[in-house]
Every structure is written in structure tokens, then in C-alpha cells.
Amino acid sequence: MSFHKEDGVNSLCQKALHIVTELCFAGQVEWEKCSGIFPRDRGSQGGSSTDISVSLLAVVVSFCGLALLVVSLFVFWKLCWPCWKSKPVTSNITTLPQSISSAPTEVFETEEKKEIKENEKPAMKAIEPAIKISHTSPDIPAEVQTALKEHLIKHARVQRQITEPTSSSRHNSFRRHLPRQMQVSSVDFSMGTEPVLQRGETTTSIGRIKPELYKQKSVDSEGNQKEDVKICGKLNFTLQYDYENELLVVKIIKALDLPAKDFTGTSDPYVKMYLLPDRKKKFQTRVHRKTLNPLFDETFQFPVAYDQLSNRKLHFSVYDFDRFSRHDMIGEVILDNLFEVSDLSREATVWKDIHCATTESIDLGEIMFSLCYLPTAGRMTLTVIKCRNLKAMDITGSSDPYVKVSLMCEGRRLKKRKTTTKKNTLNPVYNEAIIFDIPPENVDQVSLSIAVMDYDRVGHNEVIGVCRTGLDAEGLGRDHWNEMLAYHRKPITHWHPLLELPGRATSFDSQGSCPSPKPPSTP
């Protein structure tokens, strides 16, 4: 019985203690009444939490202070370091001329700072200042410029490496006939005090715009050229673009006031057309007999896309037909801008002046050939590859072309070779090699004259056009020859335009005197 009573008392005590705990910690009873029951536990909990909060706050404050100190030191170093480092420049400006004789000075200028460092090495015999000036840096103060000029005048020394290849006696005349080659021996490389001053003064003007370099000088030159061109009539034609079929429709109406080419005081004119740069597609009108004001009224169509018209040129050539000789070119009309009159959506009428034909304007065709020279064997090989767009010399509108190559020396023909004849074509293909024996000592004295001939079984053969290559040639002919001499044993190929024969005596007949090339010496 006593045992059961003790268990009941203990359970009642535990329940009472549980109820008191809930009442105290739930806030339903004031804490002052409960402090006698739980004094030690609650106080220890509040003290420990307060200590943890204070220590954590101290750590955070210490870390922030350290970070602030590091940032402050970095900002101070950034702001004060350039000012402190630039102090030697102003202090050494006044003493720069006096310190030159004792130690060499190195001057550097960048986009942000200028430095003068004096090396404490013993003085050398020749003082060579190294100056590096940035084009984008601010202007140098006047004191520094004055000091630098005085220093450069006294001790500047220019070093220039001149590499001039030693020339052999074989190429003396070759170099003498090159007007484009600069004579290195005639150039004055001496540098005195005045060029140094000018160089120092011009460094400050780098980057400035010079209006005199942008003057339009082409206006006057074009006006003078237009005055020199002679007018030999007018040509009337119309232009329209067919958007559905992508065709440029050209209608040649008439020509007025053409010059007389026949003995009777008239001409037999016709017009030939190209849409440049394509020369394969061409059109030609009918020939109108004995008239200076022909009425053509013929329409032609060029297949071309509309977006390509801005890159095309319309070329008209007016010819005088001759039954027994080659046709004479009266003049030409070149329409550089097809949209000059309108957008070609409607038919536009155009009147253009016919410019008289010149030697350069006459389209006789082109020839392609290669040159190759073997100096050890003394052998030159000219390979005639092909021709294109040759002038029609026969009544049928074609030609029977062959190529004749002559080895010339001071106007005298030494040797000649020719290719086979290609029948009824204006674009012959040959691929035939012609070989001449020319020793190295005579290469500078000879040249080659290439003539495209039209074979005629009944009469005499006519010259379609000629071109020349050699040191005495002009333009592409000389450049082709020089390139052959520069690259031995390598075939050099170029297209050459054909020109009218200026005179038979100067190109194919024997004139003057020239020693024949010596045969190559056998080992």
C-alpha cells in the first residue's frame, strides 16, 4: 500500500512541475514569480547568447576596418605615385644641358608620363640618345624641346644602313635604260643640323590634317583632255531595259556630220557595239554606202542583269568600210554611266559626240605570249599562246591570222620567225614556241617586235596590229622584258594590246647597223 502511495505522489509532483513550467515559459505568469523556481538555467542561457553576439560583432567590425584600410592605401598610392614620380622631370629640366657632358640621357615619352633617367655610367665617346615619342601624347613643354634640340645638335649621330647590290658589267646597260629605277648613288643621305631641327619641329605636327593634300586636281586635267579631243560627228541612239527578259535594248537611230574617208568625199559607215568589259558579245549594223549622215534604225539586245548595269560600259565604234583594204575607224562613243539619262524603265533618247579615233582607241585585239630566258645556254623562248578580238580584215567579217616575230637591234631586223596560219577566225589559238639564240652580253641590245598578220592568198598580207617588248619598248612591253630578266628559267606570260603599225621602215625594214649576236661559247 505504501509503495502505491509513493508512486502516486511522484506522478502528481511531476504533473505539477510540468504545469508550472508551461505557465512560466508561456508567459501566462510573470517571470518574477517564476525566478525562484528556475533562476540558474535562464540566467546562464541569456549570458551565453549575449557573449556570442558581442564577439561576432567585434569580428565583423575588425574585418571591415581592415578592408577600409587596404582600400585607402591603394587609393593613396594611385593618386600620389604619379605626382611623386613626375617631380624629377621639372627638377632636371634646368640642369639638362649641363649634365650632357657627364652622362648620357635617355628620354622616354608615353601617353601618360614623360621620364628622364640619367645613368651613372662613365661617359662614352659617342652619345646616342634614344628618343621615343608617341604620336598621341600631349605636347612637350617648351623647356624640354629646347634642351632636346641643343642636345641633338651637339651630339646627334645618324646611323643608316645602305644596301646596294653590286652590279655586274652584264646589266650596266639594262639599268641605264630603266627610267623608273632610282639612282641610289645620286641620293644625298647626309644629315646635318638643319634636318634634325626640321624633324624635331615636324613631330609636333603629326596627326594634323593638311588640306593641300586633298585638293581636287583632276578637274583641270579632265578639262584639258576634253579640249584636246576632236569631235567628228554625232551619234543618236536610245536605251531601254526589259525587266521581264533581263535585256538591255539598244536602238541605233542615225549619225550626223561624219568625216569623209573616200576620195569621192563620202564614207561607207557602219557601227560596231560592245557592252564592256565583255568583248565576246558584239553587234554590228549594216553598211550604208556613200553617205555622211547614215540612218541605221536597227535594234540590238544585250542579255545582262539589271544589278550589273552599273558596272558596264556601252562602247560604240564607227568604221568606214573598204572593200579592198582594212576598214578605217572614224571615231568612238563610250557611255560610262548607263543611268546617265534615266533609270531605263522607259525608252530614253541619247545624243553623243563621236570622238575621233586615236592610236590607243583603235581596238585591234590582244595577243598573249610568254617569255623565258636561259642565260647559261644563251637561249630565249617566246611562246605565242593565243589572240582574241582581232580586227576583221576580210569581207566575210573574219581574218586568217598568223604571228610574225622579229629580233631587232637598233632598228635592224636580225632574225624573223612566224607561226602557222589559222583560217577564218578572230580568236586564234597557237601554242607555238619560237626560239632565238641571244648570248647574255647581247640581251640588253636587242628587242622583239611581234606583228599579227592577215594572210591573203591573192594580194599582199596585211598587218592587223603590232606590239613590242624590250628595254627600248614602252609600258607593258618593257615591264614584261624586265620581269623575264629578273626571273631566269621561268616563263612570264602577259596579254599585250595590239597597236597600229607606225611605219614599216622603223619596225620591219633593215635600218642602221648592229652587230649580230655572237653564238654562245661552247665549254
From Swiss-Prot:
The molecule here is called Synaptotagmin-10
- Give the record's cofactor note, including how many are bound: Binds 3 Ca(2+) ions per subunit. The ions are bound to the C2 domains.
Query: Which gene codes for it?
Result: SYT10
Binding-site list for Ca(2+) 3: 322, 325, 328
| Highest taxon of source | Eukaryota
Q: Which residues carry this modification: Phosphothreonine?
A: 136
Residues of the signal peptide: none
Q: What is known of its domains?
A: The cysteine motif mediates homo- or heterodimer formation via formation of disulfide bonds. The first C2 domain mediates Ca(2+)-dependent phospholipid binding.
Q: Where in the cell is it found?
A: Cytoplasmic vesicle, Secretory vesicle membrane
Which UniProt keywords are given for this protein, alphabetically ordered?
Calcium, Cytoplasmic vesicle, Disulfide bond, Exocytosis, Membrane, Metal-binding, Phosphoprotein, Repeat, Transmembrane, Transmembrane helix
Mark the transmembrane ranges: 56-76
**Topological domain spans for side Vesicular:** 1-55
